[in-house]
Amino acid sequence: MTPEALIDTDRWPLDNTALHEQLHSIFCAENVVVLPGFIRHEYIDELVRESEELMTVSHRSEVNGKVNVVAYDQFPAHSLLRALYEWDGLMNFVGKVLGEVKLFRYADELGALNLSSMIDGDYLGWHFDQTDFVVSVALQPSISGGEFKNAARIRSADNDNEDIVRAVRNGERPDLVRVEPMTPGTLMVFNGRWSLHQVSPIVGDVTRHVALLAYDTKPGTESNQELKFTRYGRMPA
């Protein structure tokens, strides 16, 4: 199976300039763009089965939350998620969404592609990202909880907005927080550098699986050593 076969190109034509411009406009305005049904529904079960198998080799990370993480070097050669990440067609499409940007896959043997798997009681606390954008593919939601909560554009390069950030963290400004839809098959491009975000606690015995695909506007990007140890518990072999 080719990576392109996984994608509903009738709904999301990857080479459509008008679509690129529309999605880029949304991303610029909201720091996030959500593409529901990007992955064809008939392939979701297969991707979930792959995720369940991968989870058996995951590392348990408990820094600012609780999550099981599968690193890039743990995805086998036949992995559909790996094939999707390594396909230039998807990378180029994301670059169009970002505004005609040339992208490169991470050179990080651990962080280029991750699977984030969260079980009952797991969560991610409020945080900002260190990168301008993250690409995710939602594969399976939990029975309850597991909401991706986003206080969009709450700070900027010129204003840390510390009082508002503190208020959101303390639950005092729910009016600034929205929940991004993460139904199975959804592709999301998200700028977490300026938007405070979290994942609410998982409830129930169904694992929440999300694939995280790392690209950058320059070649050779790697995660720093501290992040590698805290997220994967090791350095590359």
Q: Where are each of the predicted segments found?
A:
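Intrinsically disordered terminal extensions flanking catalytic oxygenase cores
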Residues: 1-14, 235-237
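Catalytic core of Fe(II)/2-oxoglutarate
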Residues: 152, 158-237
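Short strand-connecting beta-turns/loops that link adjacent beta-strands
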Residues: 40, 131, 144, 204-205
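Hydrophobic residues positioned within well-ordered beta-strands of beta-sheet architectures
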Residues: 35, 133-135, 211
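Catalytic core of non-heme Fe(II) oxygenases with the double-stranded beta-helix
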Residues: 95-100, 104-189
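Non-heme Fe(II)/2-oxoglutarate
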Residues: 11-96
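Short beta-strand segments enriched in hydrophobic/aromatic residues
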Residues: 51, 139, 215-217
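A structural signal for well-ordered alpha-helical scaffolds and beta->alpha junctions
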Residues: 87-91, 132, 192
